Amino acid sequence: LVDGLPVNACLMLAFDADVSTRDTWLSQSIPSLANVPVAYFSAEFGIHNSLPIYGGGLGILAGDHCKEASDLGLSLVGVGFMYPQGYFHQRLSADGRQEAVYEYLARAEAPLSPALTPEGQRSIVPVPVGDRQIYVTVWHVRVGRASLYLMDTDVEENAPWDRELSARLYGGDQVARIRQEIVLGIGGVRVLRALGITPKVWHLNEGHAAFVTIERLREFVVAGIPLADAITEVQRTTVCTTHTPVPAGHDAFPFHLVEKYLHPYWHQLGIDRERFLAFGTHRESWGEVFHMTVLALQMTGHCNGVSKTHGEVS
């Protein structure tokens, strides 16, 4: 022990103190951007195997963005989900069939701490999903200089079926997926507001988080800004990254689900059903759907792919 603390803890405190006092590339090269908060929304983050809330390349890229932002000195704030069961592990049964096995992550053993409001209170944030509220609590993960905030619906305020909403990455049917993505996008914005964080730039890592743009539109319209001007401002301050041209990698929902869970929003925006659905309408061979990537592309001022060729194809 050193001053009552384990040696490892003392080393980490000394390391953090040393790193925090060093100038970063951003503070030296573009000091005007050093303290500009960037909100980075992603359905998964691959930070470390002690926090298994990722399934593949989308999460690994998100984790690398957090780490690189820390190294550069960019004030990046990640927003995602705390999945206690994470993504499934593959196992073969005795007869050679693939089985999906989920392992439970004990929050007390993970590198998490409760996220606190500016008043020092544990954050419990209500999120409107249709005619109901789903409540989320928030966990904080330090990724060097960057921060990651993970939403968790497993709280007493929720019904049992809502408590399971954030249990697994990419689990459930389309009903579960649209509810989860409403919480990620709309709930994520409200979480940042509750924590006193005001981003200047909003980055959507794939279309899963595209409902961020709908919540921000609502904020502007409620503040008295005309919808056309609100759309322009959201586009000016929002960017997105798309990861695959493969249709299975893009979420699209039937109109009736969008109506069921988001109908209060077109009333708050002062528009009708058709105008709202037009934000994300895409025609498939079987008919029209509400496409999350189309929503992201229409509501952002810049979009990129994960490579030059992929960006051109997408």
Where are the regions that the model predicts?
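Catalytic cores of carbohydrate-active enzymes across secretory and cytosolic contexts
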Residues: 1-314
